[in-house]
Amino acid sequence: MRIISGKLKGKKIFFSKSTTTRPLKDSVKESIFNILTHSKLLNISLDNSNILDLYSGFGSFGLECISRGAQKITFVEKNEIIAKILKKNLLTLGIKNGITLVVDDIKKFLSRDLFEKY
């Protein structure tokens, strides 16, 4: 698993095969970003954006967003073991600023008053 585009292009993302969490395949990720960045209907730019990555897993989607210019990412992952691997990915890639890693149930997280706009 790797980062497809942007300033971190080609960098590897750690993941564990021994968990039930499945990483987002590169081909699927590439299709998602092609739709997001090239659709005239959506008109989305990741530059300086604030992204909420729910069910983050190993961070593949959020890390791709950072690589493509997102300014802030909030990762939400329930599984503490998976969250540790995500944190390792952030440290290995040298990503420190604009990152929030929340280890919590998604429904609980979304039921809170969110002060950020995503």
PLM feature spans:
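S-adenosyl-L-methionine
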Residues: 1-63, 68, 84-117
